[in-house]
Design a protein with these regions (language model features):
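N-terminal alpha-helical "arm" segments
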Residues: 1-52, 383-397
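Surface-exposed polar/charged interaction patches
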Residues: 14, 18, 27-31, 115, ...
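Short, Φ-rich (hydrophobic/aromatic) sequence segments
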Residues: 25, 211-216, 350-351, 382
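Assembly/oligomerization interface modules of large self-assembling protein complexes
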Residues: 37-112, 166-174
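Contiguous N-terminal and early-domain "leader" segments and peripheral loops that mark the onset or edge
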Residues: 38-59, 135-138, 142-172, 177, ...
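Long, contiguous amphipathic alpha-helices that act as assembly "spine/axial" helices in icosahedral shell
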Residues: 89-181, 207-239, 370-378
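Extended, solvent-exposed, turn-rich assembly/linker loops in the middle of proteins
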Residues: 166-281
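Sequence/fold signature of self-assembling virion shell proteins
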Residues: 203, 247-397
Length: 397
């Protein structure tokens, strides 16, 4: 009877079903053909961990941790790392396959040999690999989406407790958007003065349509941007905006010019199709596009389980800043810059490249814990190249 010894690398081999690790990873290219990084295009990878911002003119599944390039995933923050330096931070994450996870299957293979490798068992091993690879690739793309949304909606990228609870903290990368491009509404001019966006909490002097219209006029006349303008905001803020009574009144009077009673036109506007409301709003404020962003990320952070025991918990974090509106050029506004991570010390068949080498996925054995680690590493950064044509308004609380 064949009783060849079985180790955890056999899990990888059985799960691959005859493919190499690289061939297995290549399968995900078709799945992840959609990515929310519009306005940013990939550059060729660099040799060092720095980004360059060439400013041009116009006639703009859980997140991995950002860590020092030489540190393992989820490394503690390094105090000497400074933000605003043009450095591209490294992200790492891993899944662990251990003998507890597949103990029964491995014991059966150990006793009986390859004849025990059923299709069901192979699918189980494949599922473990798929969960790991799919999770790491998805995290890589989610991280780029998170970067893009935060940079567009805040003008900066901050690595801190909310989006990187187990890694570096207190790092802000500034992309040189001029300070006078930031607008903050105050007092009763804020669209809502409390975080519950209901009519009772509307700022008494708030007029969202006039605010946006004046902002666009300022961008055109003061800052001399003559191209097409896209207005971006969080989906929740857009939904709330379409309930603001001042907005409904203005849109209602535009749709029903013969009706003079405010309460009637507000009621009529509330019953209108959302696409029609958006079209009227866009026409009134004179922007070319309005893009609500229904986008969130998730992070793993130390916490407690349902029994109060220490555990990792998953927490949702916003991608697009919910209190802000961004005004940016339509089209490309930046590039994604980064390096191809080094994989020195790994056997060639334990390394796979994804997205042109921007993401590396490796297999590493740890005999002490009887585990195989499926690890990812990437160092990419969305870099705006038109900061002089990016504008951000904070309109509410």
């Amino acid at each position: 009877m064949n009783t060849l010894p079985i180790d955890l690398y056999k899990v990888i081999e059985y799960g691959l079903g005859g493919d190499t690790w690289q061939e297995f990873i290549d399968r995900y290219k078709e799945k992840y053909d959609l990515l929310q990084i519009d306005g940013f295009e990939f550059e060729a990878t660099k040799l060092d961990y720095t980004f360059s911002q060439l400013i041009t003119s116009l006639g703009v599944k859980t997140l991995p941790a950002y860590v020092d390039p030489e540190s393992p995933g989820y490394e503690a923050a390094l105090g000497e790392l400074e933000g605003r330096t043009g450095n591209i931070p490294t992200q790492k994450k891993f899944y662990r396959l251990n003998r507890v996870t597949v103990r029964q299957q491995l014991q059966l293979l150990q006793r009986v040999g390859m004849s025990a490798l059923t299709e069901e068992m192979q699918n189980l091993f494949l599922g473990l690999l798929d969960e790991s690879a799919d999770g790491l690739i998805g995290s890589y793309y989610n991280a780029l989406t998170h970067q893009r949304m935060r940079i567009v909606s805040t003008g900066k990228f901050t690595i801190d407790t909310d989006n990187n609870p187990r890694g570096l903290k207190g790092i802000t990368i500034d992309f040189n958007i001029p300070e006078n491009h930031y607008q903050v509404l105050a007092g009763t001019s804020r669209w809502w003065t409390k975080d519950e966006h209901i009519p009772a909490n509307q700022g008494s002097a708030s007029d969202p349509i006039m605010d946006v219209k004046n902002r666009v006029k300022e961008i055109r006349r003061k800052y001399h941007y003559l191209g097409k303008i896209r207005m971006e905001l969080a989906q929740d803020l857009w939904d709330d905006l379409m309930t603001h009574t001042t907005v409904l009144k203005r849109i209602g009077h535009s749709l029903y010019p013969t009706v003079t009673d405010d309460s009637t036109v507000i009621a009529n506007a509330q019953n209108e199709d959302e696409d029609r409301l958006k079209a009227i709003f866009k026409k009134l404020v004179k922007v070319d596009e309005i893009v609500p962003r229904d986008s969130y990320a998730f992070v793993d952070k130390p916490g407690k389980d349902a029994d109060g025991q220490p555990d990792l918990i998953t927490e949702q974090v916003e991608n697009f800043k919910a209190t802000n509106i961004a005004f940016i050029p339509v089209g490309q506004i930046g590039t994604i810059q980064g390096v191809e991570p080094l994989t020195l010390g790994y056997e060639a068949n334990k390394v796979a490249s994804y997205d042109g080498g921007r993401l590396k996925l490796t297999q590493r054995a740890n005999p002490e814990t009887h585990s195989i680690y499926i690890e990812s590493e990437a160092a990419q950064m969305c870099v705006p190249r038109m900061p002089q044509y990016m504008f951000i308004s904070t309109v509410t609380v």
